Amino acid sequence: MAELNDTYVVHTAMIRCSMGMRETYLVLDDTHGVFLRQQPQMTVDDSVGEVNVRCFGGCYSMENPSTKSEADRIQKAVEEECPDTFLDSVLNLFTGGEKEITTQEAQEGVPRIVGVCTPNIPAGTKWDNGKEGVETRGMEPLLGGAKLRCIYGGEIEIITSGQVEGTGE
């Protein structure tokens, strides 16, 4: 099979977001009239969040208001449920309440916080890998390996073309 970056992308190609919980599919809600192996071909303009780019199951980005809200909710619950221990109280007497936590201590045993994933792609943003010199209804056909950025900081990447392998018949 050809290298992904040189392969045309069709409806149901797999995509991944660097801030998402899982992979999902790239979808085409209305065909452009061009098909590859009976599957609608995608273009660089097929980059609309929640239309072409579907939910990745959850979002880890703290730039996402949903994730930030969940983090704030958890922090408040922890502060209410876990007042200072006796040791913390004694240490506070000697340190004035200042306790430095190392990065490793802060990361150990802390689960990642997840919010609602709503892919938010700025209007007019296009995928970054199209087939130049070829047009599908005036738009460049989309090629594999293309990337797109969500406003919440996630990098969305096409990881399969979506094309079904031929049987050779």
Predicted region positions:
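Intrinsically disordered, low-complexity proline/glycine-rich segments
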Residues: 1-169
